[in-house]
Curated annotation (Swiss-Prot):
Its main location: membrane. The chain crosses the membrane at residues 7-29, 49-71, 91-113, 270-292, 299-316, 329-348. It comes from the Bacteria. It is found in: Cell membrane. This is Uncharacterized protein aq_359. The lineage of its organism: Bacteria, Pseudomonadati, Aquificota, Aquificia, Aquificales. Keywords: Cell membrane, Membrane, Transmembrane, Transmembrane helix. One of its GO terms (biological process) is lipopolysaccharide transport. It is a multi-pass membrane protein. One of its GO terms (cellular component) is ATP-binding cassette (ABC) transporter complex.
Length: 356
């Protein structure tokens, strides 16, 4: 349809211009951060830093980029009264908006693929660069709810540090899960309820060990366990949960449930990534709904800003509740469910149309 191509080209033009400005701002921030904050200003470090931060910057500010693009695009459409002309031919607002909605679905699909294949690796690279080349990156204080992974030969080990005092090494709620790298079969799970971490060993005051190869479970009291990992290496050379792909998070979610580990952190991270990736669809539906219902920019903007704040809180809730507030991730499902219902209602209203 000729109108579809026209609307899509106009919207893409605005979106690309806004994205260019956004990436330019991210580049400026990265340049200033590199010049001021890095202790080593080598060309290879700068290039690696820019190549990792730019795509991540586009991903994280797409929330704002898409919102601005939609408002600018729809303002022009409604100023020209194009929606009235189209509706006079019996074309619904949903059909009229189809090019924009399909683009938002494409953007969400790209973000989901990025969370599986690209963004976690870029975050890990960025973390490593900052920890090694930025100023004042010494490890100190406390580590709480820290998740990471270490790969060695044929074994991959997932770690969770519940609470670690770096000054004396006192440790609470520490878990490790060893799995085979090829088929991800679990080999061993270590649970340390309380202990002391010194050098590359942990003195376990109270804990448990599950040996999957022998099918054996053993209580551990006042015993030293060789970990092969020092406290300094935890932050300098490890991977956090943010650096795991969607498939790895899903795997850990399943395995953690089977062996009795805290599954809420993985479930919350999975929901957060999926919801953030789907945010372009939610933003597009709601902005189209508001413009077709109210038509006047002065009435649309306040409602749109309120929606953006609510959407942001809903998206963050599955990540924050288990990781920061120690609350069940199920609490976040209620606002997510309501958001999905409200979005479906918006699609229905767009399909039905609004009285002029």
């Amino acid at each position: 349809m000729l109108l579809d191509r026209y609307l899509l080209s106009r919207f893409l033009g605005i979106f690309l211009n806004v994205s260019f400005v956004s990436v330019l701002l991210v580049s400026l921030y990265a340049l200033l951060d590199f010049l001021v904050g890095f202790k080593e200003k080598r060309t290879d470090v700068a290039l690696s830093y820019f190549l990792n931060i730019l795509p991540l910057g586009f991903y994280y500010i797409s929330f704002i980029t898409l919102s601005i693009s939609l408002i600018l695009f729809l303002r022009k459409v409604f100023e020209k009264k194009m929606e009235l002309t189209v509706q006079s031919f019996g074309i619904s607002p949903l059909r009229f908006s189809l090019p924009v909605l399909l683009f938002s679905v494409f953007l969400s699909s790209t973000f989901l693929l990025g969370n599986e294949y690209a963004f976690p690796k870029l975050l890990g690279n960025l973390w490593f660069i900052e920890k090694n080349y930025k100023k004042k990156q010494e490890v100190k204080g406390f580590i709480k709810n820290f998740w990471f992974i270490k790969k060695e030969n044929e074994v991959k080990t997932y770690y969770h540090v519940g609470n670690l005092n770096l000054s004396d090494g006192s440790l609470f709620n520490f878990y490790t899960m060893k799995v085979e790298r090829k088929n991800l079969n679990p080999l061993e799970v270590l649970k340390v309820f309380s202990g002391v971490w010194k050098d590359k060993e942990i003195f376990i005051r109270s804990g448990e060990i599950y040996d999957f190869e022998k099918g054996k479970r053993e209580k551990v009291f006042n015993k030293t366990f060789k970990l092969g990992l020092s406290i300094k290496e935890v932050e300098l050379f490890s991977e956090k949960i943010d650096f795991l792909s969607l498939s790895e998070i899903f795997f850990l979610m399943q395995k953690s449930k089977k062996v009795g580990l805290n599954v809420d952190v993985y479930t919350g991270e999975l929901f957060y990534r999926v919801m953030f990736s789907l945010s372009p669809v939610f933003i597009s539906i709601f902005s189209l709904y508001l413009f077709f219902k109210h038509k006047v920019l002065s009435q649309v903007i306040p409602r749109f800003l309120v929606f953006i704040v609510i959407l942001w809180l809903v998206i963050l809730s599955p990540k924050i509740l288990p990781q920061k507030a120690n609350q069940p991730v199920l609490y976040s499902l209620i606002p997510i469910f309501l958001l999905i219902l409200y979005s479906l209602k918006g699609v229905y209203d767009l399909r039905k149309g609004f009285r002029v």
